Design a protein with these regions (language model features):
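C-terminal accessory module of base-excision DNA glycosylases/AP lyases that mediates lesion recognition
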Residues: 1-37, 101, 121, 125-126, ...
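Alpha-helical ds-nucleic-acid-binding substructure associated with the helix-hairpin-helix region
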Residues: 6, 10-13, 25, 58-59, ...
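Residues that recognize and position ribonucleotide moieties
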Residues: 47, 83, 157
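A broad detector of the eukaryotic-type serine/threonine protein kinase catalytic domain
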Residues: 54, 87, 111, 115, ...
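A positional/architectural concept
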Residues: 20-57, 61-68, 72-75
C-alpha cells in the first residue's frame, strides 16, 4: 500500500469543488462555512495525539478547557514537558487518571525512541492506525483523528465518530448511514468530515 497524500491548499480547492459538485448538501455547507483550514495545520504530531487523548468522550468545550489547563502547566506541551510534571498536577488540571497515564506512556515512548511519530508521515494510513492502537488509551477513533489533524491525510472517514453520525442524520435524514454517504465523498472524506463537524458547532 502506498502512502496517502496530504491535505494541501490545492487539495482543499479540489476537494471543495468535487464535494460541491457531487453533493448538494455538502455544497451548502461549503458556502456556509467557507474554506476548510485543514491545509494550514502545523505538523506537531505529539501535541496532536495528546490532544486527541484529552478529547476522548468529551464535548469540544470541555476538551478545550482541559487542554488549556494542561498547556499552562506542561512546558512546551512536549514529551519531556509531560514527563517533568507530577501526575497529580495533570489530574488537578482536569485529566482523568487513565488519560494522564496514557499521555505519560505516549510521552515516554516518544522520548526513548520506541515510537517515531515523525516517521509516520511516510506510512500508509492503515499502518499508522495499526501502530497507534497498540498504545494504551489509543483506539481506532484517536488514531483516525491523528491521521486527519496530525498527518493531514485527505481521505479519512471515522465511522465511529458520534458527531459525524449525528450530522449525517440531521442533514440527510434519520435513515442516512455515514458509511453509505461517505462513498460519494471519496477521496476527500477528511474535508467532508470537517464540514460536518462545523455544522454541529
Amino acid at each position: 500500500m502506498s502512502r496517502a497524500g496530504q491535505i494541501t491548499p490545492t487539495v482543499v480547492i479540489e476537494a471543495e469543488a468535487y464535494l460541491s459538485q457531487s453533493c448538494r448538501v455538502m455544497a451548502g455547507l461549503i458556502r456556509t462555512h467557507g474554506p476548510c483550514p485543514l491545509a494550514d495545520r502545523e505538523f506537531r504530531p505529539f501535541q496532536t495525539l495528546a490532544n486527541s487523548i484529552i478529547s476522548q468522550q468529551l464535548s469540544a468545550k470541555a476538551a478545550d478547557t482541559i487542554e488549556r489547563r494542561v498547556q499552562a502547566i506542561v512546558p512546551g506541551f512536549t514529551p519531556a514537558g509531560f514527563l517533568a510534571v507530577p501526575t497529580e498536577a495533570l489530574r488537578a488540571a482536569g485529566l482523568s487518571s487513565a488519560k494522564a497515564r496514557y499521555i505519560l506512556e505516549l510521552a515516554q515512548r516518544v522520548s526513548d525512541g520506541r515510537l517515531n511519530l515523525e516517521a509516520m508521515q511516510e506510512a500508509p494510513d492503515a499502518d499508522v492506525i495499526a501502530a497507534l492502537v497498540e498504545l494504551p488509551g489509543i483506539g481506532q477513533w484517536t488514531a483516525e483523528m491523528f491521521l486527519i489533524f496530525g498527518l493531514s491525510r485527505p481521505d479519512v472517514l471515522s465511522l465511529g465518530d458520534a458527531g459525524l453520525q449525528r450530522a449525517v442524520r440531521l442533514l440527510f435524514g434519520d435513515d442516512a448511514k455515514l458509511e453509505h454517504m461517505g462513498q460519494s465523498w471519496r477521496p476527500f472524506c477528511s474535508v467532508a468530515s470537517w464540514y460536518l463537524w462545523r455544522h454541529l458547532d
